[in-house]
């Protein structure tokens, strides 16, 4: 068999590995690169129509985001994933397609003035829907036959609802070789989902290394910590605004908030309202509720057996339309607002920041990683002033963070996972980590007696009865990037402008069916703004 490493090698997004074995050609993940891009991903070395099937570890876009493009370009095989992953991909790939369409539309409006050739979106809603029709949901822990000589099993890896490590048994001639692809390995003791499953045997392992050189901070009692934040904020008469990732983190927060209300941990404000103001988060929450309870951890299943919905918070209110969203801030009752995006770069959260950042009685609570250059990172690092929608906003609200919340295993967790094999694999291929992190994790594994390496994008390896042989080293081609503080600032600000444009398009769609008088006024305001800046 032959393996080609196509993406997320010496970087953390754009996961893709191609296998050619037992007369079949197939992919493990086909993700989109996001954020900082260091090394060029390799294009598929064959036509998409020549791919027989795809196996998906979990629903995050950096593992699935190019599936609509694959379908657009002629792929017609099956996409295998766990049942919850199939459901989540149904909403996340469509959301990604909306973004692709908007970005192409924006570029064409800009390019038209300079006579540039029109550009097409990377893929469309129709492409996303075509990809979704190719999915086939499989059960955890069930060994399935994919083709003659190829069998697979998906086991829960505790990263996200539906996430899996994939065990592969490949038989060529009289030799059967077992490969294990870790997927993103989860953190221990996350609410709702199970801890990672440990696998006992493999010949070759392909494992992620996101936190391969560091451990997480000690984990506080999140329920107690959150209750303290709510108590002091509500006592001041303020709101707690939570920028939250739509899938996974929002549902964790609902779990904590339900427990806080159930135990009466916030005194004098027991019936405080909780708002979800994110269409994607609302859809994801519905999927969590509809998922087979066997996918949940023991504590969550115990609640369900008692008739308790673990993410149903008394006083929960769902904001659907833009009018619903606006009404949240007209009500001065102290409340919790969960809204996307988690790093404050786009979405309805920016409106909630505009209405709450300047109020010293309010709190902005961060519950996830904030990348360098994002508004969320700026607020956490401390700033007195931000600009939202062209308006300067003083930062007077309390800014705080629940530390240690991560869906990824840290260094100790990764080592615990790989050391669970009863016999050391013949080789560990380290993937899905930043450049130096992968190298350091290879060194750590080597010190512990493993044979390990970290291939670059484009590397090819042959695996047979005699072992693994490198056929091609891969390329260390770095993506050209603008350098300098000014360039980075310009790129960040322009991304904010693009995000604002995406939001405007969504608001327009939400107003479909409104009164003609209101729609005409809205159109006039947009045209006036365009006239001002179309120069």
Regions found by a protein language model. Give the residues of each.
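Generic long, charged, amphipathic alpha-helical segments
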Residues: 387-418
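Short, compositionally biased "basic patch" segments
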Residues: 191-206, 293-300, 370-396
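Hard-cation-handling environments
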Residues: 229-374, 386-387, 422, 437-439, ...
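A polyampholytic, Gly/Pro-enriched intrinsically disordered region
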Residues: 100-105, 292-305, 387, 469-495
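Charged, amphipathic alpha-helical linkers/stalks
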Residues: 458-521
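His/Asp/Glu-rich metal-coordinating catalytic cores
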Residues: 1-55, 60, 64, 71-252, ...
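Conserved acidic residues
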Residues: 52, 203, 335, 362, ...
């Amino acid at each position: 068999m032959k393996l080609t490493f196509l993406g997320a090698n010496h970087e953390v997004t754009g996961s893709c590995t191609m296998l050619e074995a037992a007369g079949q050609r197939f992919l493990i993940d086909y993700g989109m690169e996001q954020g900082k891009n260091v090394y060029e991903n390799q294009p598929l070395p064959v036509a998409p129509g020549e791919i027989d099937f795809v196996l998906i570890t979990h629903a995050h876009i950096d593992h699935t985001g190019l599936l609509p493009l694959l379908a657009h370009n002629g792929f017609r095989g099956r996409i295998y994933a766990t049942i919850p992953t199939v459901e989540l991909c149904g909403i996340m790939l469509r959301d990604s397609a909306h973004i692709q369409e908007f970005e192409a539309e924006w570029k064409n409006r800009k390019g038209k003035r300079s006579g540039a050739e029109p550009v097409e979106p990377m893929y469309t809603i129709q492409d996303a829907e075509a990809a979704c029709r190719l999915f086939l949901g499989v059960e955890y822990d069930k060994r399935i036959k994919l083709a003659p000589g190829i069998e697979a099993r998906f086991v829960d890896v505790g990263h996200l609802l539906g996430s899996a490590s994939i065990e592969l048994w490949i038989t060529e001639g009289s030799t059967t070789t077992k490969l294990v692809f870790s997927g993103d390995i989860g953190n221990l003791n996350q609410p709702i989902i199970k801890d990672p499953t440990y696998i006992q045997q493999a010949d070759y392992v392909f494992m992620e290394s996101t936190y391969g050189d560091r451990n997480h901070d000690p984990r506080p009692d999140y329920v107690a910590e959150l209750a303290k934040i709510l108590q002091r904020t509500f006592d001041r008469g303020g709101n707690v605004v939570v920028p939250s990732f739509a899938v996974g983190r929002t549902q964790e927060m609902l779990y904590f908030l339900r427990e806080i209300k159930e135990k009466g941990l916030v005194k004098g404000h027991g019936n405080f309202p909780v708002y979800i103001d994110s269409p994607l988060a609302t859809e994801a929450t519905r999927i969590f509720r509809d998922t087979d309870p066997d996918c949940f951890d023991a504590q969550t299943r115990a609640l369900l057996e008692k008739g308790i919905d673990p993410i149903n918070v008394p006083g929960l209110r769902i904001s659907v339309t833009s009018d619903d969203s606006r009404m949240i801030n007209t009500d001065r009752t102290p409340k919790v607002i969960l809204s996307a995006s988690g790093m404050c770069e786009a979405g309805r959260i920016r409106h909630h920041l505009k209405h709450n950042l300047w109020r010293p009685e309010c709190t902005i609570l961060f519950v996830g990683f904030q990348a360098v250059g994002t508004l969320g990172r700026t607020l956490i690092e401390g700033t007195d002033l931000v600009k939202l929608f062209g308006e300067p906003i003083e930062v007077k609200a309390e800014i705080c963070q629940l530390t240690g919340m991560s869906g990824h295993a840290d260094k100790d967790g990764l080592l615990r996972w790989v050391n669970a094999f009863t016999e050391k694999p013949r080789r560990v291929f380290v993937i899905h980590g930043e450049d130096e992190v992968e190298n350091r994790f290879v060194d750590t594994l080597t010190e512990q007696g493993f044979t390990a390496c970290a291939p670059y994008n484009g590397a090819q390896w042959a695996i047979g009865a005699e072992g693994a042989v490198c056929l091609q080293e891969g390329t260390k081609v770095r993506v050209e990037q603008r350098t300098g503080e000014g360039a980075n600032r310009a790129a960040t600000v322009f991304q904010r402008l693009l995000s604002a444009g995406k939001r405007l398009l969504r608001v327009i769609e939400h107003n479909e069916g409104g009164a003609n008088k209101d729609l005409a006024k809205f159109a006039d305001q947009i045209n006036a703004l365009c006239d001002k800046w179309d120069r």
